[in-house]
Amino acid sequence: MAQERSGIAVGLNKGHKTTPLNTPKTRISRSKGKASRRTAFVRDIAREVVGLAPYERRVIELLRNAQDKRARKLAKKRLGTFTRGKRKVEDMQRVIAEARRVGAH
């Protein structure tokens, strides 16, 4: 929180004396797009049951062959925007790492 003003015209703490606002929680409107724990859990279960989409399998194959740029281009083409494609490629890299971890044990 901001420090209370001193009432003096100069210095780091200059300005009229004010009472600081105490806003406890963030607005609900700011939390849009954040997945709840329940939603994340349900999506995780669905991913386990259903598996990967064909384009996701192809992205993984490209990543395994060290063709990151091609994988990003494919994901961008399938998903529409560069940012979504980038996020999907990161997600697929996480899937590969998890598979390696499971395979090692």
UniProtKB/Swiss-Prot annotation:
Molecular function (Gene Ontology), one example: structural constituent of ribosome
Compartments, record wording: Cytoplasm
InterPro entries from the UniProt entry: Ribosomal_eL36 (IPR000509), Ribosomal_eL36_sf (IPR038097)
Record key words, sorted: Cytoplasm, Ribonucleoprotein, Ribosomal protein
Glycoprotein found in the keyword field: no
Biological-process GO terms, alphabetical: cytoplasmic translation
Superkingdom, natural source: Eukaryota
Broad class of where this protein is predominantly found: cytoplasm
Cellular component, GO, one term: cytosolic large ribosomal subunit
Tagged with keyword Amino-acid biosynthesis: no
Region named Disordered: 1-36
Family: Belongs to the eukaryotic ribosomal protein eL36 family.
Subunit field text: Component of the large ribosomal subunit (LSU).
Function of the protein: Component of the ribosome, a large ribonucleoprotein complex responsible for the synthesis of proteins in the cell. The small ribosomal subunit (SSU) binds messenger RNAs (mRNAs) and translates the encoded message by selecting cognate aminoacyl-transfer RNA (tRNA) molecules. The large subunit (LSU) contains the ribosomal catalytic site termed the peptidyl transferase center (PTC), which catalyzes the formation of peptide bonds, thereby polymerizing the amino acids delivered by tRNAs into a polypeptide chain.
Name the UniProt record assigns to this protein: Large ribosomal subunit protein eL36
Organism name: Emericella nidulans (strain FGSC A4 / ATCC 38163 / CBS 112.46 / NRRL 194 / M139) (Aspergillus nidulans)
Biological classification of the source: Eukaryota, Fungi, Dikarya, Ascomycota, Pezizomycotina
